[in-house]
Each structure stands twice: as C-alpha cells, then as structure tokens.
C-alpha cells in the first residue's frame, strides 16, 4: 500500500472518529442532556454543564432567536428593550454577576437610573402636583415600608405568619384599603407594582421586603440602552461553548431554533422530547427552562404527569405581566434635564399609565417616551387595538401637560408577553402564603427532568441575575446526578 493511500485512509478514519466522538463520550447515539429554551437560564445551564465535561448537549428553542425575555426591537430608529432592561442591584458589597459582563466585558451603554427627584415629577390632571405635599406622602410611604421591613424580620421562617404587603400597610397606617388618594396610589404603585408587576394585596411581605437583590448587590440600577441589545449578554455566554459564524451569530448544530417542545416523556432510563414539527429527540436528561407561565399553560405535556407536589408548586406561584409601551412623538413637550428622567401620573384609577420615563440620555433626539403598565392593565391593553391604547395615552399626556402643544403620537410599540404562548407573562412574583420550602419544590427535579429559570431562584426570582444564577444552580444538581450519582434531591428551606 502506498504512503498516499495509507494517509488517505488515516484521514478518513480520523474524520469518522471525530464525528462519532460526542456519541462515544455519551455512551449512546443520543445527547446526554436536552435543554428546553435558550433564554439566559437555559444558556447559563448549558454553559455550566459543558464546563463540567458534558459536551453532548442539545438546546431546543421555540422561537427564531436566543435570549428569551431579553429581547431588543427596532422602534423610532433605535433598538429598545421590550423585555428585561435594567441591571438591578449594583454598587453594593457583593457584585451582581451580570454587571461585569455588561459594564466591563461587553461595555454596553448603560445609565444609572435616578429616582431621587421623583417628588417634583408627579402629575395630576391639570399639571404638576405640589412638590412639598408629594414629598410628605413619599416620606410617609417610606416610613411604612421601613416598618414592613422590621415586621418581616420577626416572622417565623416557616412562612406561617406571612402576610401581604397590603396587610402590613393596613397595620401601620390604619387604612382599610391601603393608599387611596391619587398621589398615595401613584407612589404606592411606583414602590411595589413597578418592581413586582403585581399589587401589594397579593405580594408576600416576608419574601420581598426587603428585597435580597438590593440588600445583597446595592441599591443602584442601570438601564441598558445599547444597539446590540441586552440580549448580547446571552449571546456572549452562548459563544463560550457554542460555535459562531464569522458575523458572531451562534451557528451550532447543538442549538436548534423554531423547535416548539410539546411533549416530554421520562422514565428511569432516559427522556424523549417531541416537538410541534413532529421531531423526536432522546437523551439521558432534560433541563426545562421554559417560563413559569408556560409551565402553567398546556404547551408542554409531561408523560407521565408530574407528581401532585410539583404541579401544586407550579400553580401556586404568580406569573406577572409587566408591559413597557414605547411612544414616538414628532417633537418633545416634556421636561428634560437633571432629575427629570422619571415622572408619575396620579390618576384616580390606580396603575392607569402611571410610570413614565424620558430618554434624553439614552436615545437623544428620538422623541420617545416609555410608559409602564402591569397586571390587569397589561392584560386589558394586550387585548385591545394599539390605536385604542394610543388614544388613551394621548388623553393622559394632554391631561398632564395642559399648557403644552402636545402633538399626536406618530408610532407606538406595545409588547404582548402575556399573549405570547412561548412566555405567558413577564416574570414571576412571590405571592402571599407560599413558603420557601414550596418555592424550592419549583426547582426540584422529577426523575430525569430538571427545571430552571428565574422562577426557580428563591433569592432573586424575577431578575436577570436570578435567571443566570438559577441556570448554574440547576446545572449543578444535574451534574451531581450524571457524574457523581448523587441523584437524591432534598428540598431545602423547610422549617418546623
């Protein structure tokens, strides 16, 4: 046999072995792990699993992109964030793990949000409210919130004494319905609903006051306004273990887009995942990073049905809706300058187009305002035409600025996270009456089915850093089973 022939055979064999290597490593012709969802939790989990030496991972994503609820969209000539927007919890003793990626690694444009001058930016029908009066009401609200922190610290760890934030407010202010004047409702909405996307009457006091995100990482928040999008954080993480093309886009056979998972079957020997296009995938384990809203819907069927304790944990928690409505105008009519970025509308109808933000720094000359609504207002607005929403907004801004020549808005962008079957909401909120033990049941695996997502982060649910850390934590649980045969999972957080 000639040397060229020998070399050719060697190259063919080497190529064949290289192509088979992932299957040989796994011991089967199937991937070790399937990850459902390519948001930051799924991508973070995949990265940690890969770092542990389990390279044979397959990611199935329902949409045509990665990033999940971190998603930029073009509007008024700029890219705006219709989902996650802030790095929340910065400049504290501990470092928020997302902040170095945003600020140092990727150097995304971000701006510290200044809420300190809010008292001078509260509007009613007819113009500005009296600043001294608003400040007095805000000071009182801060006193009540501080009393809530003190009360929260005394509650039994089991959660048996937990109460809603509204109940705490009643105790401290002796008001049967909580804050009820337009200014008090506006301040209350900004304090709680703007953070949790649900009202104080349903939100757990013990598990949200004070918020670990801010006690751990600091009180500052930074608004990401970069044309690459906040989602570039997810692309950065994915690029550390998935291949990319020359343009930097993820182009790896281990990531399959437009794969809508509809069924997950599991047994003691493996899992089978079926998608809407009739594709079938098998693996040793599956990591489900779908949102809490999706788990509460009928999009994914589990066979056999998940045990009752798991189903109860899923349905006990709230999937909140947080809607950021962007509005484009032909000219500016609102105040700008230091201390003017955020302003409130004190309506007799709580949460009615209540929190506004102008973008003098973030998107100069774009003439865009952002108004945020939540909960029932979000659901109502998602179900009506954008033209109706625009008309309602125009009525509000003309009431706030009666002395200005307010032109008609030229464009509007209304995200619809609640209506989207791949999300069914914006982020999770911790409701009254659910213990840490029950929360940990959300994360707990069922056989070879593992779960991750911001809703599985007991300490930081609802936040980007919570989703990122949850991916790592859930991956560690899977790795312990796959590599160390430590498959028994003890639900933590239970107290007597």
From Swiss-Prot:
A Gene Ontology biological process term: thermospermine catabolic process
Pathway this chain belongs to: Amine and polyamine degradation; spermine degradation
Cellular compartments annotated: Secreted, Extracellular space, Apoplast
Glycosylated residues in this chain: 103, 150, 278
Binding site for FAD: 61, 69, 261, 454
GO cellular component: apoplast
Assigned protein family: Belongs to the flavin monoamine oxidase family.
Cofactor(s) named in the record: FAD
Main subcellular localisation: secreted
Function: Flavoenzyme involved in polyamine back-conversion. Catalyzes the oxidation of the secondary amino group of polyamines, such as spermine and spermidine.
Keyword list, A-Z: Apoplast, FAD, Flavoprotein, Glycoprotein, Oxidoreductase, Secreted, Signal
InterPro entries per record: Amino_oxidase, FAD/NAD-bd_sf, Flavin_amine_oxidase, Flavin_monoamine_oxidase
Protein name: Polyamine oxidase 6
Enzyme class, broadest EC rank: oxidoreductase
Listed GO MF terms: flavin adenine dinucleotide binding; polyamine oxidase activity; spermine oxidase activity
Protein induction: Induced by salt stress in shoots and roots. Induced by treatment with jasmonate.
Source organism: Oryza sativa subsp. japonica
Pfam short name (any one): Amino_oxidase
UniProt EC number: 1.5.3.-
Annotated cofactor note: Binds 1 FAD per subunit.
Signal peptide: 1-27
